[in-house]
Structure formats: structure tokens, C-alpha cells
């Protein structure tokens, strides 16, 4: 069976889909974000950039499954906090959803799956858009499934809740989830060390002002909280465009707990639970279900974002499997 992806970024979605489908091409925006990484790992895969230049006629009636990962930023919790819950309606990136969905009409596949963050299904998020697309898909003769899933129950080594809009010509049976307890961060790191030794890969960087506080940061604690213990509010100095506190660490930098499941990966921000450093990119890839030898092109500091912005391979494999069974 044949598949085609849209907005696949570094290629995590394709890694999972390829276990069940022959992937024909990627359709990307222009310029294609992380195209060099996708090319390094799938050198023979055609990648078409720019929605106006997608060769739709070339692939019409030749694709069984279209899988899509349009940008989720319009529905991120951070964006909603700063810009308001309805800001997504004016975000130009939601066009990526329409470009992907329209391939149902243009390619006539047996199925399509579009992934995003759960807030796209919230009444205060993109729910009206989801229902609009649902009605359109049903009029085209497709059955629609709204799938909310935590990736840890598909074999992923961390918790990652995501929404999938799935339209199929045949009945979909989203079953076979594994609800056994997911491995803890400590167990995953031990497994990584047993398989790959001490080579953690590129260690993500911290600022010099953050490093002195690492030894004081407890498991399960934000480095910002640690910093604030040593720097009471009366000592804070604000500056910059948003009036932030100078020298205070990013809120996303947490020291993980060995006894708990790793939370969602949003970049290379996590602090190792037992060593005073951030994670290495190979450790992060292992947590995310990527091969540790996956080739990430571009600046090393971008690898965390490359991993975080896509669909994790184990989740992609699960979605591809249930879609294939429906076909």
C-alpha cells in the first residue's frame, strides 16, 4: 500500500508509517522546515516544497493513505495565554490544515490522518474547524474518527497526548493499546545506557548563569524554582521587550524524576535526573522513539526542536497500523 505525507518536518511520522506503507513523497511548505534532515534519512524520497507546486495530479488515485502533521502552534497553550483563545482563527498557519484536508478531494485516498495538540479539539480551541472538516469528509463518503491518545500507550517512552483527525472509507477500529505502566525516566535511561553506553550525543547547552544552580535543583523541580529560592523577588531586575526577570531560567527547564514517566518533550530543555547537565540528543531521541543514529542536520542546538515538532515514530506506527487494517 502507498502513503504520502504533508508537513512532516524531520521525519518522525514517516519512520512509523514506513513500517506499514510504501511512502511515495512528502509535500512541504516552502522552504521545507528540516528538509535536510528528512533527506539525510530518506535520500530517495521526493520532497515537494510550496503548496502551489504540490504535484497533485501525479499522485491522484495512487495513494492509499495521506498522513499529515500541520503546525500545532495556533493551538498551543502558550499561544492561547498570550494572544487569546480565539487567536487561532487569524493564524495563517491553519491554512496547512486546509491544504492537507483538501488532498481527500484531490488525491482520493482511502484514508487521511491529521495530527495536532489536544487543544485543537477544545471548545476554546479549534473544535469548530474540526467539526467543519468532519462534515465535509462525511459528505465525501468517509467515516470520521476523532482520536485522543497518549503516546505512552503505543510504546513511546514518554507521555505525549495528541489528537488525530482520521477519515477512512472503511470502518476504523482503534484498538490494541497497551495500558501497562510506561517505563519511568530512570528505567529508560538505564535501558539506553545498557544498549548504547555512555555516549549521550550532543549535550544541549545551558547558559553560564544557570549552571551554578544545577547542583541545587531537585528531581521534579523547575530550575526557575531553584533560582527563585536563591533570588527573592525584591532582588529581581526586569528588562527586555516583555519585562522579563533578567537571569531567571526558562520555565521549561525541569530536572526529571527517575521514578516518574517522562513528560511531553518540547525541545532540548530537560535536565538529567542524576547528572548536572541537560539531556544529550541521543538520549532524547531514545525517549522519543527515534533510532539513536538518526541523522539530524543543521545546528546541533536545533535537534531538540526537530524531535519535538513531529509525530513520534511509535505513535505514527500505531496510527498507520490501524489505518492499514481498516483498508
For every predicted segment, state its role.
Residues 2-22, 35, 136-140, 162-327:
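S-adenosyl-L-methionine-dependent DNA methyltransferase catalytic core
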Residues 54-57, 102, 154-155, 252-255:
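Short, flexible, glycine/charge-rich loop motifs used to bind or transfer phosphoryl groups or to couple energy/partner
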Residues 56-63, 155-159, 307:
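Short, solvent-exposed polar/charged micro-motifs at secondary-structure junctions
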Residues 67-68, 114, 267:
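Redox-cofactor binding/interface segments in oxidoreductases and associated redox assembly factors
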Residues 70-71, 109, 157, 291-292, ...:
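Proline-centered helix-kink/hinge sites
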